[in-house]
């Protein structure tokens, strides 16, 4: 039977001082499944009984090994009283005819972890398989197969010992599009296996490095209806879909890594007919203004200030987050590549970032790249994309919600104490603000330094990034490609001891300064990543833990549905933010009680009277959609697009509470015409009257 000792039983054992064999007594909090216990099962094949040496209990089971697929399997399945972390150890009798690669697999709450043990040495004692999280009951197990080196594998006892949980951390690598990783099924299989062997729990896969398909690593690494597919993918293969399936089977998250603004290295962008037809969406350096698309830092790049560019990028985010079971979206190069950029390729385009700046600021002419107000506006442009993407990711129809919204953050030079002195600030990447506002769930600071040359830079950035995390996760991006194994291990250990929320290594395929060395993965699992761990939870996205929620929406001209740029949004009378070029706003960290909190949100914009919604429900960890139509706004036009149609009816159906059963769900206040905190037949009659308007 499975042996679980209570405190009372332990006391009796101490008094009796029983020792049936020469092995130590079972300790409190331990569960041991021997090969004669009910929790042990022969799943397949022939297993003989042996008693040579000093087994745990009376005997053990053994099977002849085989090459290729396993022909014999056994399982130890404990009954655990509580969910939690457990040290898992195996007992076996060693011998010269034993396999030196006995294939154990631990099936735990977050997936399955293969471990290979040398049974020729170290037996007649407990040998660790690692520390794993198990759910209470009988859902966990340890399995042994016989596909190993000659001649036999030994199945004796497995011990599960409850321990304190290691700190949850994000352990990922960047898998870039320029090397092996996910171009075909075998590459994905190998990548996932290496992630498991290294005790990684997430993969950041570069599914969009360029928006054209001119050469390898350019194009989409998923079946996209928006971006042309990359040319170096095996025929008929969907890299992202297959990667998600294989990684999830191993308990590993997959995050879609996207570069938003980098389109191509030549004009026009091959295969991308949408971007070919919109050269006005591109940004150039100040000296190239108005001359059509020109390279910036050798690359053709989109204009971060263009509303149409934002919509194009959000369509990509929605496709990934809604159509694929990704676990997150990860941005890279979410910044300007140089300060002397952000100017329009075509001056006739009235929605360029520069034209928006002129309209909003009242400035005339073309500002210098060093102009402080113009620089602040370019920071605003990039921030507008990040905060909008935060909503698209958080509200995606995805079974893995809550998804993680993350970004790679630059950390060039030594770490200053003021964020405005950072290289990120100079490239208009205001990432401390993004973390402070909660637009990111985690920032991944690209702390890429050779530890033999710049040890203080690395450590200073680790320490400073923790201070700038506010109440979100900060993760250290570490560079094996610049270091030998020993220095990488030293850097990772420093960051973990400092208290970061995780490590991301760059990159999957380049694991040392000497190049590609796959032995990195068993090395790191034997050192800094010694045990498998779970990813950190996001308490701000858990309604049982969070104390705040988010309001978002669009502000439009109610008569036409056209977006209103730079409208001011107020919460309970206080200014809380402005709309972007698409009329989109996001207000985070709004206090909410256990049952939600009603608050007033209002909007003011030049040329319109103020519009007030007095009873907007904010829910803990919730995302309340609150759209505004300025001027002539039809009752029932939920999405404020200038009409009352089937889209609005779908919303009304979900908000209909009946009399006295309010308040309506978050966002439903817009249908409560008589402001009696419900949506009933009175409100429905008004909706009917305007439907089709």
Model-based region annotation:
Residues 143-152:
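Short beta-strand-plus-loop segments that form exposed binding edges in beta-rich domains
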Residues 592-621:
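A short, solvent-exposed loop/turn motif at the edges and junctions
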Residues 166-185, 256, 261-323:
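Active-site-adjacent "subsite" loops/lids of carbohydrate-active enzymes
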Residues 539-543, 613-636:
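Extracellular beta-sheet/turn segments enriched in Thr/Pro/Gly and aliphatic residues
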Residues 431-432, 436-455, 465, 472-541:
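Substrate-binding cleft of secreted/luminal carbohydrate-active enzymes
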Residues 549-557, 628, 638:
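A short, amphipathic beta-strand motif
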């Amino acid at each position: 039977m499975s042996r679980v000792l209570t405190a009372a039983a332990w006391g009796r054992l101490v008094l009796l001082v029983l020792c049936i064999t020469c092995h130590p007594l079972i300790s409190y909090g331990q569960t041991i499944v021997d090969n004669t216990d009910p929790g042990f099962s022969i799943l397949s094949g022939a297993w003989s009984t042996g008693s040579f040496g000093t087994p745990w209990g009376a005997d053990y089971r053994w099977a002849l090994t085989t090459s290729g697929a396993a022909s014999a399997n056994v399982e130890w399945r404990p009954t655990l009283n509580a969910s939690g972390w457990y040290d898992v150890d195996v007992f076996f009798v060693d011998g010269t005819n034993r396999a030196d690669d006995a294939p154990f697999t631990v099936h735990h709450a977050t997936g399955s972890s293969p471990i290979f043990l040398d049974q020729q040495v170290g037996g007649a004692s407990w040998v660790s398989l690692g520390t794993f999280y198990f759910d209470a009951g009988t859902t966990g197990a340890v399995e042994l197969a016989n596909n190993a080196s000659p001649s036999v594998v030994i199945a004796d006892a497995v011990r599960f010992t409850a321990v304190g949980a290691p700190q949850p951390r994000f352990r990922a690598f960047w898998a870039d599009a320029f090397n092996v990783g996910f171009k075909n099924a075998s590459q994905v299989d190998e990548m996932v296996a290496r992630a498991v062997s290294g005790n990684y729990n997430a993969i950041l896969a570069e599914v969009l490095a360029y928006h054209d398909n001119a050469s390898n690593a350019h194009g989409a690494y998923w079946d996209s209806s928006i971006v042309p597919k990359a040319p170096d993918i095996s025929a008929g293969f969907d890299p992202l879909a297959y990667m998600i399936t294989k990684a999830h089977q191993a308990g590993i998250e997959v995050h879609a890594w996207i570069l938003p603004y980098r389109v191509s290295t030549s004009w026009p962008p091959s295969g991308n007919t949408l971007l070919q037809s919109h050269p006005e969406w591109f940004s150039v350096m100040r000296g190239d203004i108005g001359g059509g698309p020109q390279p910036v830092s050798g690359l053709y790049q989109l204009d971060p200030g263009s509303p149409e560019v934002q919509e194009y990028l959000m369509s990509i985010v929605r496709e990934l987050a809604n159509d694929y079971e990704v676990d997150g979206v990860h941005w890279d190069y979410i910044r300007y590549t140089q300060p002397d950029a952000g100017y329009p390729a075509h001056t006739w385009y009235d929605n360029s970032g520069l034209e928006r700046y002129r309209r909003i600021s009242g400035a005339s002419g073309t500002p210098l790249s060093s102009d402080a107000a113009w620089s602040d506006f370019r920071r605003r442009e990039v921030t507008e994309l990040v905060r909008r993407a935060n909503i698209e990711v958080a509200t995606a129809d995805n079974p893995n919600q809550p998804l993680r919204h993350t970004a790679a953050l630059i950390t060039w030079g030594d770490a200053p104490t003021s964020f405005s002195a950072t290289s990120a600030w100079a490239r208009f990447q205001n990432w401390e603000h993004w973390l402070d506002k909660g637009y990111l769930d985690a920032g991944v600071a690209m702390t890429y330094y050779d530890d033999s040359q710049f040890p203080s830079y690395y450590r200073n950035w680790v320490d400073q990034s923790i201070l700038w995390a506010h109440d979100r996760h900060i993760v250290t991006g570490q560079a094996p490609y610049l270091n030998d194994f020993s220095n990488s291990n030293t850097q990772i250990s420093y960051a973990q001891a400092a208290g970061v929320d995780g490590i991301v290594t760059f990159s999957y395929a380049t694991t040392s300064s000497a190049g590609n060395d796959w032995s990195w993965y068993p090395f790191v699992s034997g050192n800094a990543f010694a045990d498998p761990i779970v990813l950190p939870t996001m308490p701000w996205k858990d309604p049982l833990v969070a104390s705040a929620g988010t309001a978002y929406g669009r502000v439009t001209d109610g008569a036409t549905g056209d977006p209103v740029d730079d409208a001011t949004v107020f919460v309970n009378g206080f200014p809380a933010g402005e709309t972007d070029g698409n009329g989109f706003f996001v207000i985070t960290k709004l206090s909410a009680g256990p049952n939600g909190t009603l608050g007033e949100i209002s909007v003011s914009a030049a040329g319109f009277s103020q519009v007030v919604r007095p009873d907007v429900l904010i829910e803990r960890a919730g995302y309340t959609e609150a759209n505004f139509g300025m001027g002539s706004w039809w009752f029932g036009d939920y999405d404020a697009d200038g009409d009352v149609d089937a889209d609005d009816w779908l919303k009304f159906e979900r908000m209909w509470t009946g009399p006295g059963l309010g308040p309506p769900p978050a966002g439903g206040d817009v249908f409560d015409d008589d402001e009696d905190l419900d949506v009933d037949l009175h409100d429905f009659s008004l909706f009917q009257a305007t439907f089709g308007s």
